[in-house]
């Protein structure tokens, strides 16, 4: 944010100094000056980058080496007049581009979501007059009138504050509202401690005042985040990178083979050029796994549907694959690992210490003496009842149940926590009447009310313990009054502060008969301390389990928060985060160079008092160490880091629209445990993708080998381009879906994340492709050699070869469904997808072999039943051979 001035940042300047530095006055600037500054600084709007038009994004999907092969093949077939081949090949290329374009249709809306956070109108003071203007017309030097419920329209320096409290959790991650004041601050302070600044996009919780505009548009803190989002280039997932490399390797192999065969055929075979070119086009089409991109997308989409049923919405398809490789989750604390609902966990009185059950705003939970297992019933007239009535009445918040049955509070979270505590017990009936009130203010750090309770006037007080200690001379017990034992209270405060609890004290004093007004002077004597509440934003119980699951799966969890280090470490220990006994702050991170930051990112698991830049840099530092990073969060402050992360995970209920749009995955139940389920599903999907790739590639190799053998031997072209495309786009794609429904392995969440550097086509995969592809090709070639001397037509022979390859594919799909063990196991019956795709495949083959219009289009002929039997036997023999190969090659395989 543009808060630096020659005299120091704006938060270090007094109100007068700030007015001087912005050339403004308490009455604001003139309309003429505002117009001039609008020309100088521009509109109070976030900069926008021009997006690519849809047609250009569509054409970009043709920028792929394998698509180049198809386009070249289409061009050559068109020149040769083979229009059916041309149209089919072009259709395949267009379908692949369309699938990629549709995937991209959820493209970046993050920046627009940030812009939507800006309010539309603001009340300003110009030349002493109040005016309502569009927020886009705000300029530095304007004075903005602030009221409860307003969304802050620009970055402001507070120049007037009346009990002003602001909700900044979306920006800083702090779960408590921030008290704002006009006083100048000293030292270098993180965002959350700049209590005299108001930030664009945050919301006024209560109170009001005025603020001087010190930054607009792209110069605001929100603008800074907007720029970070715009500058981030999203990483490609490991699988996509590997597919690119595989495509380029196939492209080079195709060029070399085509060149070699072209020269060989010209020199040693008397083959017409047109026939030779058609053979080479068939070879090119056969070598390209045209259906693979579409199949990968569809399998990922099926994984997306499964995750959606498990309450994880995947916004970007490749995220499904990346989840399986994730090694680190960087999680925001507030609202993600914790409830974002401040809850009282302990009550300290002069007589006893109590623990309080419950972890949310729902008013359910017993109160136990700290050393007793059984809960107590709060009796009328006891110290505890007086304490609970005090925190209930000296309170501006309300506890309500919304239409969906969720409990919520209005007002600040600290008062809300006290209100919930009081609602957990049934207080004895008493008539109450509020006579007077001193609202809470950060200047004096307490709130006080004057009530008539029954027939007595009573003054009730809640506030910071150190302030109430100065007001109190006595403490209340169940047996009467005692002198204040301040060392006892300070020891208890220190004890519970180490556990991350924030402390709020409560006190009372009798009021004078007939008193109707309350002043600060009334609180300077005779105040009696009742007790202290220790409260915290508690961990989500399900998050504790989820973190354990992640650790078991080899995924390290790191907590990144805007809270204080002691609070962060306490929460970290409760959650079971690995190195929760040590924390490092954003201030320490800021002075580190990249090398030091990289080491700190690996060493620490708790990062406190962090800014958006810190979170962003931490993700980058972990990625520099080759970690695959997931980042969870719900506030705007998390959005840049979410976008930078390999997997950005947003909260669906409490998350802002900005965060959701920046994320790759949105949890609809805000449940950290859903991440563990998503990781499990991501690993299952990747396993099935690898099985699918291993299934498809041997068929392409077999097709290519058949054509190469035919050219070398001077035989008939065994497969035309359209038949090859039928196998690659129809039968291969259909059968691949059967593998997509395979269940996950039993040890899927007990093995470490896979290494992204390991190629899906590892040594074993290459062996399997060559072994199976060669076996299929040799079988088909032998069958072709047997058929040719018997006078069958080329169309008949090609139809037999097509059925042979398709049947071999079907049996090999059964081989691929189980990496180890026999494929015809019980799981085969459980996977209904196998049988559905088998039925679809049968229908497709019947159509292409026996339907007249398909025969005309693809050049096939009807087959007698005995050829179905022959091809079935060939396929079954190959199935048995691969099953025998599995145990022999087990030691070569990678996990």
Where are these regions (language model features)?
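Generic alpha-helical transmembrane segments
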Residues: 731, 776-777, 799-813
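Membrane-water interface at loop-to-transmembrane-helix junctions
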Residues: 755-774, 794-800
């Amino acid at each position: 944010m543009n808060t630096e001035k020659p005299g120091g940042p704006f938060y270090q300047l007094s109100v007068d100094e700030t007015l001087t530095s912005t050339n403004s006055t308490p009455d604001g600037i003139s309309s003429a000056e505002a117009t001039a500054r609008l020309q100088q600084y521009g509109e109070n709007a976030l900069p926008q980058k021009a997006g690519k038009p849809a047609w250009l994004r569509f054409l970009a999907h043709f920028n792929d080496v394998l698509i180049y092969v198809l386009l070249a093949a289409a061009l050559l077939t068109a020149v040769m007049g083979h229009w059916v081949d041309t149209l089919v090949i072009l259709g395949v290329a267009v379908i692949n581009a369309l699938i990629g374009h549709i995937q991209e249709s959820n493209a970046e809306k993050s920046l627009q979501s940030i812009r939507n956070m800006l309010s539309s109108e603001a009340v300003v003071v110009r030349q002493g007059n109040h005016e309502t203007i569009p927020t886009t017309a705000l300029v530095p030097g304007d004075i903005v009138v602030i009221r409860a419920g307003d969304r802050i329209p620009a970055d402001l320096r507070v120049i007037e504050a009346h009990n002003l409290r602001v909700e900044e959790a979306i920006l800083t991650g702090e779960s408590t509202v921030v008290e704002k004041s006009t006083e100048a601050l000293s030292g270098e302070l993180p965002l959350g401690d700049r209590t005299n600044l108001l930030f664009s996009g945050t919301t006024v919780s209560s109170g009001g005042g005025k603020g001087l505009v010190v930054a607009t548009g792209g110069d605001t803190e929100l603008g800074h985040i907007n720029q970070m989002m715009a500058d981030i280039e999203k990483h490609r997932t490991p699988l996509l990178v590997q597919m690119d490399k595989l495509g380029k390797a196939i492209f080079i192999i195709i060029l070399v083979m085509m060149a070699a065969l072209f020269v060989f055929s010209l020199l040693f075979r008397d083959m017409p050029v047109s026939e030779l070119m058609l053979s080479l086009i068939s070879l090119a089409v056969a070598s390209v796994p045209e259906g693979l991109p579409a199949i990968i997308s569809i399998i990922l989409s099926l994984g997306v549907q499964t995750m959606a049923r498990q309450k994880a919405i995947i916004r970007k398809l490749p995220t499904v694959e990346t989840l399986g490789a994730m090694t680190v989750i960087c999680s925001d604390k507030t609202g993600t690992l914790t409830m974002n609902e401040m809850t009282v966990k302990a009550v300290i009185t002069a007589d006893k210490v109590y623990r309080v059950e419950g972890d949310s705003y729902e008013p359910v939970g017993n109160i136990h003496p700290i050393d007793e297992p059984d809960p107590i019933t709060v009796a009328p007239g006891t110290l505890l009842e007086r304490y609970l009535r005090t925190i209930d009445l000296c309170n501006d918040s309300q506890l309500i149940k919304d239409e969906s049955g969720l409990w919520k509070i209005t007002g600040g979270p600290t008062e809300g926590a006290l209100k919930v505590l009081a609602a957990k017990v049934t207080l004895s009936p008493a008539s109450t009447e509020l006579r007077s009130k001193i609202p809470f203010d950060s200047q004096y750090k307490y709130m006080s009310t004057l009530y008539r309770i029954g027939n007595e006037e009573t003054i009730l007080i809640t506030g910071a313990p150190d302030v109430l200690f100065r007001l109190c001379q006595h403490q209340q017990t169940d047996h009467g009054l005692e002198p204040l034992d301040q060392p006892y209270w300070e020891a208890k405060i220190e004890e519970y502060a180490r556990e991350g609890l924030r402390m709020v004290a409560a006190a009372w004093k009798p009021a004078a008969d007939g008193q109707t007004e309350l002043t600060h002077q009334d609180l300077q004597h005779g105040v009696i301390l009742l007790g202290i509440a220790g409260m915290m934003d508690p961990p989500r119980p399900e998050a504790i389990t989820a973190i354990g699951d992640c650790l078991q799966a080899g995924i390290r969890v790191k907590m990144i928060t805007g809270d204080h280090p002691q609070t962060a470490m306490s929460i970290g220990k409760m959650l079971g985060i690995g190195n929760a006994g040590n924390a490092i702050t954003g201030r320490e991170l800021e002075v580190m160079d990249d090398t030091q930051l990289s080491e700190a990112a690996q060493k620490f698991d708790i990062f406190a008092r962090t800014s958006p830049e810190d979170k962003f840099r931490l993700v980058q530092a972990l990625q520099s160490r080759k970690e695959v990073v997931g980042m969870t969060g719900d506030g705007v402050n998390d959005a840049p880091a979410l976008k930078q992360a390999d997997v950005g995970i947003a909260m669906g209920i409490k998350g802002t629209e900005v965060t959701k749009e920046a994320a790759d995955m949105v949890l609809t139940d805000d449940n950290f445990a859903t991440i563990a389920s998503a990781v499990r599903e991501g690993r299952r999907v990747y396993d099935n993708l690898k099985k699918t790739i291993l299934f498809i590639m041997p068929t392409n190799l077999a097709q290519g080998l058949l054509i190469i053998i035919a050219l070398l031997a001077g035989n008939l072209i065994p497969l035309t381009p359209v038949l090859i495309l039928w196998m690659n786009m129809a039968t291969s794609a259909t059968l691949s879906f059967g593998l997509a429904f395979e269940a996950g392995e039993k040890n899927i969440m007990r093995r470490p994340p896979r290494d992204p550097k390991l190629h899906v086509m590892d040594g074993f995969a290459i062996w399997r492709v060559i072994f199976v592809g060669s076996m299929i090709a040799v079988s088909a070639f032998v069958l072709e050699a047997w058929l040719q001397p018997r006078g069958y037509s080329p169309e008949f022979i090609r139809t037999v070869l097509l059925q042979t390859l398709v049947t071999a594919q079907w049996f090999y799909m059964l081989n691929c469904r189980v990496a180890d063990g026999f494929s015809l196991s019980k799981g085969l019956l459980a996977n209904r997808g196998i049988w559905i795709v088998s039925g679809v495949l049968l229908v497709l083959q019947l159509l292409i072999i026996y339907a007249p219009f398909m025969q005309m289009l693809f050049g096939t002929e009807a087959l007698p039943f005995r050829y179905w039997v022959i091809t079935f036997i060939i396929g079954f023999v190959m199935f048995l051979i691969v099953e025998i190969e599995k145990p022999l090659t087990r030691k070569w395989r990678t996990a």
